[in-house]
Curated annotation (Swiss-Prot):
<keyword id="KW-0699">rRNA-binding</keyword>
<comment type="similarity">
    <text>Belongs to the universal ribosomal protein uS4 family.</text>
</comment>
<comment type="function">
    <text>With S5 and S12 plays an important role in translational accuracy.</text>
</comment>
<dbReference type="InterPro" id="IPR022801">
    <property type="entry name" value="Ribosomal_uS4"/>
</dbReference>
<dbReference type="InterPro" id="IPR001912">
    <property type="entry name" value="Ribosomal_uS4_N"/>
</dbReference>
<dbReference type="Pfam" id="PF01479">
    <property type="entry name" value="S4"/>
</dbReference>
<keyword id="KW-0694">RNA-binding</keyword>
<keyword id="KW-0689">Ribosomal protein</keyword>
<dbReference type="GO" id="GO:0006412">
    <property type="term" value="P:translation"/>
</dbReference>
<dbReference type="GO" id="GO:0042274">
    <property type="term" value="P:ribosomal small subunit biogenesis"/>
</dbReference>
<comment type="subunit">
    <text>Part of the 30S ribosomal subunit. Contacts protein S5. The interaction surface between S4 and S5 is involved in control of translational fidelity.</text>
</comment>
<dbReference type="GO" id="GO:0015935">
    <property type="term" value="C:small ribosomal subunit"/>
</dbReference>
<dbReference type="GO" id="GO:0003735">
    <property type="term" value="F:structural constituent of ribosome"/>
</dbReference>
<dbReference type="InterPro" id="IPR002942">
    <property type="entry name" value="S4_RNA-bd"/>
</dbReference>
<dbReference type="InterPro" id="IPR005709">
    <property type="entry name" value="Ribosomal_uS4_bac-type"/>
</dbReference>
<dbReference type="GO" id="GO:0019843">
    <property type="term" value="F:rRNA binding"/>
</dbReference>
<protein>
    <recommendedName>
        <fullName>Small ribosomal subunit protein uS4</fullName>
    </recommendedName>
</protein>
C-alpha cells in the first residue's frame, strides 16, 4: 500500500485530528460516505485498524514502511509501542515539522527531498533519516531555502516545539539535545492497539 495522496479532510473526518497530515479541521464530525452518520458498534479489529491508520496517515508512510518500523521497535529494548512512536518522531521530515520548518509532515518531506535541509552540516534529502541526540538540523544556507523555512515559521503547524529540540530561529537551526519523550507526541494515539494489530501479522 503506497503513501496516501488523496483528499486530506476525508481522512481527518474518519480518523480525527491528524496534525502531521493537515492544518485544516473537518467541518463535519461524522465519517465520509453515504452511511457516515450511522452509528454502529465497532469490532475490536476495527478499533485497532483505525489506530494503525492514524499513525500511517499522520506520519505519511506506507503500510510496508510501518511494518518495518514495527519490526525494528520490537527488536529494541523496552515498550514496543513507545519505541515505535519514537522511531516515527525521529524521522527527519517529522523533526522539521516539529521545528516549524514545514507546515505539515508532507510539506516538510518536500523540504527535505528538495535538498533544503542539512544534518550536521551535510545536505540530507532522505526524509526517513533517523535523527538522534547530538544531531544539528538546519536549513541550507541559500536564499530560497531560508525564505521557505522563514515563511513556515511565522505560522507553524504546532504551537510548541518539544523541549528536546533546541531551536535557534535566527540561524534556522536546531540541536537535538535528548531522546524523544512520549509525552510530546502530538497525535492522540493508543500505540498498544497498533502493536496488537500487528501481533499476528508481523
Amino acid at each position: 500500500m503506497s503513501r496516501y495522496r488523496g483528499p486530506r479532510l476525508r481522512i481527518t473526518r474518519r480518523l480525527g485530528d491528524l496534525p502531521g497530515l493537515t492544518r485544516k479541521a473537518a467541518k463535519r464530525s461524522h465519517p465520509p460516505g453515504q452511511h457516515g452518520q450511522a452509528r454502529r458498534k465497532r469490532s475490536e479489529y476495527a478499533i485497532r485498524l483505525e489506530e494503525k491508520q492514524k499513525l500511517r496517515f499522520n506520519y505519511g508512510i506506507s503500510e510496508r514502511q510501518l511494518v518495518r518500523y514495527v519490526k525494528k521497535a520490537r527488536a529494541q529494548e523496552g515498550s514496543t509501542g513507545t519505541n515505535l512512536l519514537k522511531l516515527l518522531e525521529n524521522r527527519l521530515d517529522n523533526v522539521c515539522f516539529r521545528l516549524g520548518f514545514g507546515p505539515t509532515i508532507p510539506g516538510s518531506r518536500q523540504l527535505v527531498n528538495h535538498g533544503h535541509v542539512t544534518v550536521n552540516g551535510k545536505i540530507t534529502d532522505i526524509a526517513s533519516y533517523q535523527c538522534k541526540a547530538g544531531d544539528v538540523i538546519a536549513i541550507r544556507d541559500n536564499k530560497a531555502s531560508k525564505q521557505l523555512a522563514q515563511a513556515n515559521l511565522e505560522f507553524p503547524g504546532l504551537a510548541n516545539v518539544p523541549p528536546h529540540l533546541e531551536l535557534d530561529k535566527t540561524k534556522l537551526s536546531a540541536k537535538i539535545t535528548a531522546k524523544t519523550d512520549r509525552e510530546w507526541v502530538a497525535i492522540e494515539i493508543n500505540e498498544l492497539l497498533v502493536v496488537e494489530y500487528y501481533s499476528r501479522k508481523v
